[in-house]
């Protein structure tokens, strides 16, 4: 990246400097330079904040706090700059996912930050959420990446495409239909992601078709490094099937369930006990039957927890829709001005 003329040859700081020296130079720069100058050195700033955070977060809390306060100070400027992205990334590092997502939308960062930096931030956010097993938030960030305007699709967009769809089927047991009409990125990605589309279709069909698709496309999944999501989807596959059967049947033969999952009856019984403890096994005419018992009533405490989870899920969904709307508006504005 070529720096502004004022800094060519004499950058005020460098991310590869000794952390102690970098800390002094960076905090001095943040407090003395304008938003425009920050944006001109955006990649250096992002790399420097990452370097300082990695050096001090957890091991030197007082020094990390200096870094965070400097970034937070710059992010309070009404004019959006790269410092806002750094601020949001540090909120993620601290595990403040809800605050980060809310701030991301309140500050309208997506209207002002270049698409390349926005993409990096959303991917970073998705990784953090995955690392803390917050799958629903990770879905929101991956979904957002698909609607960031770009002239060239990258491996990040491909990763976001299959990660979102696989996470969606992992958490819901359903396939999400991405709308190519609202993003120019979706259609070309979909053409390149046929193995994943076939996997999702097979997942909803039957286990034999699923096995065939996995065998056919396993080398592609390995190449894309998506096998963790594929294996996770397979792990929860019996759970989604059980949920579907529970809605349709009051009882089923264990032999039928084992056949549908292509496993032995003993293994099927273990899986059922793992995923659904509201079932009974009975023997009639030498055959084992699974009876789906009624689920427990929801207590006031559980009702409150479920309501809170629903509120959080609703906020995440609304946030993703707002981001999608903002980015789509930018696309349409560019088309109209072209």
Curated annotation (Swiss-Prot):
Subcellular location: Cytoplasm; Nucleus
GO biological process, one term: ubiquitin-dependent protein catabolic process
Predominant cellular place of this UniProt entry's protein: cytoplasm
The PCI domain, residue ranges: 137-306
Keyword Nucleus included in the entry's annotation: yes
GO annotations of cellular component type: COP9 signalosome; cytosol; nucleus; prospore membrane
Keyword Cytoplasm appears in the UniProt entry: yes
Domain of life of the source: Eukaryota
Family the UniProt entry places it in: Belongs to the CSN3 family.
Oligomeric and partner information: Component of the COP9 signalosome (CSN) complex.
Protein name listed in UniProt: COP9 signalosome complex subunit 3
Native organism: Schizosaccharomyces pombe (strain 972 / ATCC 24843) (Fission yeast)
Gene behind this protein: csn3
């Amino acid at each position: 990246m070529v720096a502004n003329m004022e800094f060519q040859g004499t950058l005020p700081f460098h991310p590869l400097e000794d952390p102690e020296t970098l800390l002094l130079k960076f905090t001095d720069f943040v407090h003395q330079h304008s938003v425009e100058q920050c944006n001109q050195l955006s990649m250096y700033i992002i790399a420097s904040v990452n370097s300082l955070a990695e050096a001090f977060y957890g091991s030197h809390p007082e020094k990390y706090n200096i870094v965070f306060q400097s970034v937070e100070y710059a992010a309070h400027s009404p004019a959006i700059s790269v410092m806002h992205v750094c601020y949001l990334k540090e909120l993620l590092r601290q595990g403040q996912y809800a605050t980060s997502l809310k701030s991301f939308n309140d500050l309208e960062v997506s209207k002002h930050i270049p698409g390349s930096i926005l993409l990096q931030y959303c991917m970073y956010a998705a990784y953090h959420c995955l690392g803390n097993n917050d799958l629903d938030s990770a879905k929101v960030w991956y979904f957002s990446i698909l609607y960031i305007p770009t002239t060239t699709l990258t491996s990040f967009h491909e990763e976001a495409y299959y990660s979102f769809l696989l996470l969606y089927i992992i958490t819901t047991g359903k396939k999400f239909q991405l709308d190519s009409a609202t993003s120019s990125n979706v259609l070309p990605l979909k053409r390149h992601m046929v193995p994943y589309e076939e996997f999702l279709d097979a997942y909803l069909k039957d286990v034999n078709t699923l096995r065939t698709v996995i065998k056919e496309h396993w080398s592609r999944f390995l190449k894309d490094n998506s096998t963790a999501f594929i294996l996770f989807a397979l792990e929860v596959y019996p759970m989604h099937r059980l949920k579907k059967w529970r809605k349709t049947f009051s009882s089923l033969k264990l032999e039928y369930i084992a056949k549908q999952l292509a496993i032995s009856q003993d293994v099927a019984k273990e899986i059922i006990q793992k995923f659904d403890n509201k079932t009974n096994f009975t023997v009639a005419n030498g055959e084992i039957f699974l009876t789906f018992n009624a689920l427990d009533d929801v207590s006031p405490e559980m009702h409150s927890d479920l309501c809170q989870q629903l509120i959080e899920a609703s906020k995440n969904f609304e946030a993703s829709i707002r981001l999608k709307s903002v980015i789509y508006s930018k696309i349409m504005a560019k088309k109209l001005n072209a």
